[in-house]
Amino acid sequence: PDRLLHSMAQKTVSLVGEAVKRSPTAGIALVTQLTGEHGRQNFDRVTHTKTIESILSSLDEEGLQRYLAYLRDIIYAPTSAAPEDAKGIAMQRQSACDQMLGLVRSHLVQSSSGWVRDVLIFFAGHGYYAVKNPVKGPWSAILQVPTVPFTDALREVCRSRLQACLIELSEPDERGTPWSLAVMDMLDTMEKDHKHFTTTARPIAQERIQRAKSMLHQMRNASKKEKNETRKLHLRAFEILLASVILVTFEDGDDAPDMVDSVVDAAKLLFFDDKASQREMDGMELLTDALIGLLEISSAFLRSMTIQVFSAFSSSMTRDSLNHLVDQLGMGENEDAEDDEIKEDEEDDGDEEEEEEADD
């Protein structure tokens, strides 16, 4: 059947684009048929074409919103799997989440803050919080109580897909806010709404998150008042880093290392210490320690965000902080080891020459 799908897709893909441009509504109908109950959710991968992506690239904002609504319906009320088929439901739901992420990643699909925000709200509302009662207001169509309860595994999928989206979203939203900070605003709204949302974070994670949020709010207030452009850039970069740490900290268990302390301490020294000279020296070294610690954590998301911060602060790093970076990365040790090896080789060569002269 996969070969048949591939053959059919190859013959029709050249005709689909023009047809969808003439009638975007027909495009949505075609997508739902190709990826629905009688098709394949991973149609493009199975057929080795970009049929679905090509159709989606021809849709306007309204069409993309309808496509996302279709994917949410699959997640909230799976139809192609029986209620007792937990594995089938899980696969169907994860595939729909992957398609949402694919939409954000696609370079062919027209990006807009409207539908991108809806994707992030969905992943945030079900990954970092659980919807316990029907939501009212502008989020009511996006966040619903599922007919089959979400598993912890699906919530983990939502968290990882949201983080993957943020790696892709390098440009800010329509208000100029970095998307990671826009997600923080979403989570703050959910945290205050106890009637409809409950957090997925464990008590240890909640305590760490509150410490990080307190510093994040302090930094965002300072950023609004800051006049120096370089310092404002540094504040914004650090806000993004702190937001990223919060998103990963949501998953912390009792044995997880505390990522918050080192980042918060660095922020205090860099931005809120009264002694400017002390701030420059100690703050950059503490920042270096914090960033290296984050790079050691197995998280592609944190790695990506950490590298962004390195880039923002690179021009302001002092000689001491650069030397500290070399020490922390073990680069100096490697060079010393290489020097020792060279000296040993030279000494060995000298010994051999002396032995040869003695023999003569």
Each language-model region and where it sits:
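Eukaryotic nuclear macromolecular-assembly scaffolds and interaction domains used across chromosome biology
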Residues: 1-339
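Long acidic, serine-enriched intrinsically disordered low-complexity regions
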Residues: 328-360
